């Protein structure tokens, strides 16, 4: 366990530097709270859990700061950062003088509308972005009438969403252990499952990549050049491109656990691919086909192709592999060029599945080596992001175990999870949210309002997906 008597420096990898220095990875956990509960006591236990977690994962309590080298940063954890004071107490109940206009009862009845939970008052992030020292974690306990909204987000520079899932599993375990009634139970649990090994925090395997890698040796740049000769599918949008963010919609849908399995089996049967097609392949293919059909005209005689951007995890494909609980960045956005209107959902699923063969140790080492050779990658971060050029982005959180986390005491399992940050661009996105304890998955679909209306009327979509009206 780390000492709190000296400053600790966490060196960052080229992949860490490639990620945006923003709090794009963020969730709001939502619980009902009895009116008899002492909210100061709940905050105290959350803080104790965070304090213990920072002792085990020191970079979590630190700040991303410049190193003095152009475009280079590190994480600096000061002695005072180990006390859990990153967690902000925010009383938004009636009579607090700072009340939030929505009670827990009302937001639950309205099915926890996504737009409510991106309110600036629920998060300290906006204020943090003006600082030179950016805290790794943004944590705020918002007590509303009858409930708690716990905001937790992290700088993408520090870790990816898989690492964040691992960190929050440890945090929830530590919060649970802080309640007096939970102490004995926690001792009897298999705490080995939550022990932070040194290898989980070791970023050295990702510090150096392949040597002498030029820009056009990297798959994304080669793909960008090849695709520059294709017609842009956005020339065939059914409706004109949106000119205001108000023309976009955050639509919410749900797919049941049973439908997920049936979807995979149905698509697999089209091509006798039962043995290898995954549920995530099938779901991504369905989303690609249906969202494109809702947005892009199918009347053109030309073959239209465009990029689906998905995130793949490098932990298991690296040689040697990283620990599954590695707590840095190893996941990368990965563009896959597909037919905009494939002949079948199976055809799209097959192409998505086969694309993973290109996401391998060499691919990741080439990117690391290329970035490492640049020195200052500030401009390259922008150039690299442009290579993704997505027609659709899928950020799949389905397999994250957020709903399985028991926070103990007055909290227990969260009642709901909602994304903490609003979308602020016009890039269509689908976010399969963490599976609930019954296996059902909410899908957040960010597209033009006109396209969302057509998506709700799509027969193929409606065969598997149910709209959730907030």
Swiss-Prot record:
The active site is at residue 156. It is an enzyme of class 2 (transferase). Gene3D superfamilies: Chloramphenicol acetyltransferase-like domain (3.30.559.10). Keywords: Acyltransferase, Transferase, Virulence. It comes from the Eukaryota. GO terms for molecular function: acyltransferase activity, transferring groups other than amino-acyl groups. Pathway: Polyketide biosynthesis. Its EC number is 2.3.1.-. Acyltransferase; part of the gene cluster B that mediates the biosynthesis of botcinic acid and its botcinin derivatives, acetate-derived polyketides that contribute to virulence when combined with the sesquiterpene botrydial. Botcinic acid and its derivatives have been shown to induce chlorosis and necrosis during host plant infection, but also have antifungal activities. Two polyketide synthases, BOA6 and BOA9, are involved in the biosynthesis of botcinins. PANTHER family: ACYLTRANSFERASE EASC, TRICHOTHECENE 3-O-ACETYLTRANSFERASE. Belongs to the plant acyltransferase family. This is Acyltransferase BOA11. The gene is BOA11.
